[in-house]
């Protein structure tokens, strides 16, 4: 191999299973940078699709958890079984988003922010991507809540207590979500998006498909069962609760939950994770640029980085 063209040498084990920490950060920046090059309609379509996937799996999770909320069954297994089943079903949404390359706002708070900090996207591009992804996620999640969950009658309220367990499960979840104080909701949202952003980072780090699925599944399961607050999931759940006339109000939904959840999710991705990662690995990305060039814009799963060590002549 000619001088200056040798491959970047890493641990043989990591070649088979995972990237190094430096490579993971580089892939994260490149992934975030790539989003800035999509036209508005493409970004919106990808964001709507992600919102629909969250709605699909939140619907399934609510039905599955609601079946264990049947009043007689609840006396024997308790409400913890409903939470377990709900949390176990919901991570499928994130696997669908990864497989289709859809665009989720909460993951962008990490990836696109690292690209902004590395000056690979402008502030205007950053705001464009973040606002379109949030709006598209909202549109997809709320549309699914109305056209499928509400119009199908799956969460319809019944006067007969033996048939009302699905509605009651949704109602109790919604009431709990709007009962938090503003600060409590922000804190719960921070905890949530740490797990979600780590799930994105696992996809960028782990090369083995089964290992990636396993890691993402349990990262998302952890936040779902812990009762953390996720802005897109809450858009679906709380707007559906409004549609089926649960014990919630518009002002409580949007100002007591969705607003602080949005703030907390952003803090987690942009400040808790993106800023420290940038500080630790910013020079690794600069070294990568000097040896490789400007890189390429690829999808989350297909992004491939081949570092060259031309500076030391090895």
UniProtKB/Swiss-Prot annotation:
Inhibited by the Malaria Box compound MMV007839 and its derivatives BH296 and BH267.meta. It is a multi-pass membrane protein. GO terms for molecular function: high-affinity secondary active nitrite transmembrane transporter activity. Disulfide bonds: none annotated. The keyword Kinase does not apply. Pfam families: Form_Nir_trans. One of its GO terms (cellular component) is vacuolar membrane. Residues 69-78, 150-185, 233-257 are extracellular. Residues 1-47, 100-128, 207-211, 279-314 are cytoplasmic. The chain crosses the membrane at residues 48-68, 79-99, 129-149, 186-206, 212-232, 258-278. It comes from the Eukaryota. It is found in: Cell membrane; Vacuole membrane. The keyword Membrane applies. One of its GO terms (biological process) is nitrite transport. InterPro entries: Aquaporin-like (IPR023271), For/NO2_transpt (IPR000292), For/NO2_transpt_CS (IPR024002). Keywords: Cell membrane, Membrane, Transmembrane, Transmembrane helix, Transport, Vacuole. It catalyses: (S)-lactate(in) + H(+)(in) = (S)-lactate(out) + H(+)(out); formate(in) + H(+)(in) = formate(out) + H(+)(out); pyruvate(out) + H(+)(out) = pyruvate(in) + H(+)(in); acetate(out) + H(+)(out) = acetate(in) + H(+)(in). Monocarboxylate-proton symporter that mediates the efflux of the waste product lactate in the intraerythrocytic parasites; active in acidic-to-neutral pH range. Transports L-lactate. PANTHER family: FORMATE TRANSPORTER-RELATED (PTHR30520), FORMATE_NITRATE FAMILY TRANSPORTER (EUROFUNG) (PTHR30520:SF6). Belongs to the FNT transporter (TC 1.A.16) family. Homopentamer. This is Formate-nitrite transporter. It comes from Plasmodium knowlesi (strain H). The lineage of its organism: Eukaryota, Sar, Alveolata, Apicomplexa, Aconoidasida.
